[in-house]
Amino acid sequence: MAADKPLRLLLGFDYGTRQIGVAVGQAVTGQARELCVLKAQNGVPDWNRVEALIKEWQPDAIVVGLPLNMDGSPSEMSERAEKFGRRLNGRFNLPVFTHDERLTTYAAKGERLAQGQRDGYRERPVDALAAALLLEGWLAEHPN
C-alpha cells in the first residue's frame, strides 16, 4: 500500500491471537521502541485501545508483522495478520504495510535473556519488543 505523504512516525504491531505487541518508530532515526501489549481474544483486540494509541501517537502509517514459515511461504497465521492489517486500514484510514517477522520473537527473547530475564514471559511478555524489532526491520528496508 502506498503512502501519500512522508512517513515519519509509524506504529508496529506484532499480531497474535492472545496478545498483540505494539511499538512506535521514527523514520528519521530508523529506531523503534516498545509501547505496550494489547490483550486479544482469538486475535481480536480491544479496538478502543487501538484507537486510543492511534489518537495519541498519530502515526503516518502502520506496519504489521507477517508470520511467514521459515521457507518464506505463508503460515497459518499470515492470513489472520493480513486481515488484521486490512481492519486497521479500514478503521483508521492509514497506510498499512506488512513485514516479514520471522525470528523476531526469538530475537526478542534473546535480548531479554541478555538482560537477565530467564522466564516469566507471561508477566513480562516480549510481544512489544518483537513489534519494535519488526518495525526497525521495515524502517531499514524503507529509508526515507
Curated annotation (Swiss-Prot):
What's in the GO CC field?
cytosol
Q: Which Pfam families match?
A: RuvX (PF03652)
What biological-process terms (Gene Ontology) are attached?
rRNA 5'-end processing
What residue ranges are annotated as transmembrane? none
Keyword annotations of the record: Cytoplasm, Hydrolase, Nuclease, Ribosome biogenesis
Q: What is its EC number?
A: 3.1.-.-
The enzyme class is hydrolase
Q: What is its main location?
A: cytoplasm
A single GO molecular-function term is:
nuclease activity
UniProt keyword DNA-binding, yes or no: no
| InterPro entries given in the database record | RNaseH-like_sf (IPR012337), YqgF (IPR005227), YqgF/RNaseH-like_dom (IPR006641), YqgF/RNaseH-like_dom_sf (IPR037027)
What does it do? Could be a nuclease involved in processing of the 5'-end of pre-16S rRNA.
Q: Family assignment? A: Belongs to the YqgF nuclease family.
PANTHER family given in the database record? POLYNUCLEOTIDYL TRANSFERASE, RIBONUCLEASE H-LIKE SUPERFAMILY PROTEIN
* NCBIfam families (UniProt xref): RNAse_H_YqgF (TIGR00250)
Name of protein: Putative pre-16S rRNA nuclease
Taxonomy of the source species: Bacteria, Pseudomonadati, Pseudomonadota, Gammaproteobacteria, Pseudomonadales
